[in-house]
Structures are given as C-alpha cells and as structure tokens.
Amino acid sequence: MSRTLILAEQLISRPSVTPEDAGCLELLAGRLAPLGFTCERMDSGPDSFRVSNLWARRAAAGGGAPARTLVFAGHTDVVPTGPPEQWSSPPFTPSHRDGRLYGRGASDMKTSIAAFVVAVEEFLAATPEPAIALAFLLTSDEEGPSVDGTKVVVEQLAARGETLDWCIVGEPTSVRKTGDMIKNGRRGTLSGKLTVRGIQGHIAYPQLARNPIHQALPALAELAATEWDRGNDFFPPTSWQISNIHGGTGATNVIPGTVVVDFNFRFCTESTAEGLKTRVHNLLDRHGLEYDLTWTLGGQPFLTTPGELVAAVQQAITDETGITTELSTTGGTSDGRFIARVCPQVIELGPPNATIHKIDEHVVIADVEPLKNIYRRTLERLNAQAAAA
C-alpha cells in the first residue's frame, strides 16, 4: 500500500466531526516537524466549540531576497455520517472495495491532505534546500460555522506581517477523474433574513387585517426576476434564491402578522455586497413594505486569473495524466475566500467530488497517487521558477 493511502486511512480512522480534530493535527505535525517545519497551534473558539488550527511553515534555503511561500490549505473536520447502519462499512473504518477507499472524509478532504504531505516529503527528499518556503494551514472548522478556523489563522498571519504568494486548497474539485477540473475562484455569498410585518386577524375579516404574505409576494417575484449582473468570462451571473419562507400560526383561519423569508445571493466579481444590499432595500421600499432585514456576508468572491500558479498546476496535471484541465468558479464556498485576502494566487485541486457528504463516501484508489504526483510536480515547477529568478 502506498504511503499516501496509509496516511489517508490514518486520518479517516479519526472521527473528526466538526469541530473535533480527533488527533489529526497531532498526527500531521508529527510528519511535518522532522521535515523542518515549525508547527504552531492556533486553536480558537469557546470551550463548547473549540477549534483546532495548525500553521506549519518551513523556510526556504537561506540568504538572498525573501523567499516566496506556497501554502497548502485544508480541513481535518468532516460532516456527520448520517445513520451508520446505512453505510456498507463503518464510516470511520477505512475499507477497500472494488478499487475504492471508503470512509467519511475520504474525498472531502483527508486524501488531499495525505497526498500533499507525502508530495512534500518526496519533494524535500529530492530538493532538501528549496528556493521557496512551504507552509500548511489546517483547521477543524471548515464544514461548520468557519468562524474560528482558517479565518482566525489568516487574521493572525496578517497581523504579524507574514506574506503568502501561492495557495493550493485541497477541496475535491474534480468531476470524473483527478485533475479534470480545478477552481481558480469562487463566488461570494450574501444571505438575508427578511421579516415583513402585517396585521394579524381573522381570515374572514381581511379588511381588519393586513396580510404580509400577500404584500411580500410582488416584491419577492421582482427579486426573483431581477438580472443582478451578466457575469463575466470567469463567473456566471449573480443569482438570488429563496431558501425558506415561514408565515402563519398553523391555524387555517388566521391571517399571519409576519412572514419571514430567508434568501441568498451567490455573487460574482461584477457585483459587490454593498451594491446588492442597496438594490434590495430600494426595491422593498418601492413596494411600500414594513420590514426588517438582517444581512450575513459569508464571503467575498475571489478570482485567480491565469498566471504562475494556474500555469504550474495545469502543466502538472497534463504531465501526470494527459488531461487538459478545466478552470471553474462554480460550486459553493471554501476557505479559499479567507486566504484570498492575504494571498494573491489561490486555486483548489482535489479528487472527484461525486460522493462528498454522502453515505459511502469514497475515492477511487487509482486517483490517489496521481493526485500526490500532481501536487509534487507543482512544487517542483514553482521551485524551479523561483530558483531561476
């Protein structure tokens, strides 16, 4: 069995449901410290939701101008398993069947972490004095609130003036085969909770009440039909979607006094959070609604245009697999949104994502070593460029 698979299984066997780390970071620090990494814990959060964070950095070969830094970012936490009896094998017992490795976190994203650790081990064995600095940013709070994880580490790094140049996030980005898709950006996410106030009353006497659902519907229809922007070469147009509508007392003869609507923007770089907020408020005001609206900005959009990192990863994928990879900004958010604040080039690359968060999550074993090799080839290419500069 390959060293990558062995490490992946060791990580999968640790039941690290958010915010638990279950010893994953201790295991990983034990692999990184002998390679010359300085491992620093940056745990955060209240005792009731304590998050484990690791920042591990290895300096470049000494002398000269400040070295550029490549960071691998990942999360050791996983989502809940769902009913264990529905799994074909225990979710935290790594199992091999039909050429696949099964277990919670196999694809999201413990195999990616294992692959990058082994890639770094192989790279440093061949290049013990690299021209670039290497770092790992790992957290146990990506699948949850994402408040005390990567966000906190990035803030601490920024406060002490540490600079990052390239970042690879090990999210499962591939579709059918490892390397067929990478993410070079993500849309922003902006959520709103709208409460429209009316007057509660008997359903037989509407003249004595004011139905907030009826009042809200025209405004909601207009919001749903609005073209917020047209997207661009890298992003689809900004979308607005309702996720929940709550109104009524449960009785069938009462006009409700309020209706609550939860909605979300996934917005591209053609729009801003403040601009979207202003447009929504103007629309609601125009409809004459009596309302309250609270906003939650989950993350700004980010984009890494084709450059050093994208080119290095694309070439590594082609050299290893023969695939011409597709650049994409689709899908949900990731911790890349926090890292992009302090790192100009961020991409995401990992195994196929067809089974993430599902019963019987797995990776195809034949995809594992190519992923490790792609990471190693990327390291080699970026290091060669830095050495030649």
UniProtKB/Swiss-Prot annotation:
The keyword Magnesium does not apply. Its cofactor is Zn(2+); Co(2+). Pathway: Amino-acid biosynthesis; L-lysine biosynthesis via DAP pathway; LL-2,6-diaminopimelate from (S)-tetrahydrodipicolinate (succinylase route): step 3/3. Keywords: Amino-acid biosynthesis, Cobalt, Diaminopimelate biosynthesis, Hydrolase, Lysine biosynthesis, Metal-binding, Zinc. The active site is at D77, E142. GO terms for molecular function: acetylornithine deacetylase activity; cobalt ion binding; succinyl-diaminopimelate desuccinylase activity; zinc ion binding. Pfam families: M20_dimer, Peptidase_M20. InterPro entries: Bact_exopeptidase_dim_dom (IPR036264), DapE_proteobac (IPR005941), Peptidase_M20 (IPR002933), Peptidase_M20_dimer (IPR011650), Peptidase_M20A (IPR050072). One of its GO terms (biological process) is L-arginine biosynthetic process. It catalyses: N-succinyl-(2S,6S)-2,6-diaminopimelate + H2O = (2S,6S)-2,6-diaminopimelate + succinate. Catalyzes the hydrolysis of N-succinyl-L,L-diaminopimelic acid (SDAP), forming succinate and LL-2,6-diaminopimelate (DAP), an intermediate involved in the bacterial biosynthesis of lysine and meso-diaminopimelic acid, an essential component of bacterial cell walls. PANTHER family: ACETYLORNITHINE DEACETYLASE, N-ACETYL-L-CITRULLINE DEACETYLASE. Homodimer. Belongs to the peptidase M20A family. DapE subfamily. This is Succinyl-diaminopimelate desuccinylase. It comes from Paracidovorax citrulli (strain AAC00-1) (Acidovorax citrulli). The gene is dapE.
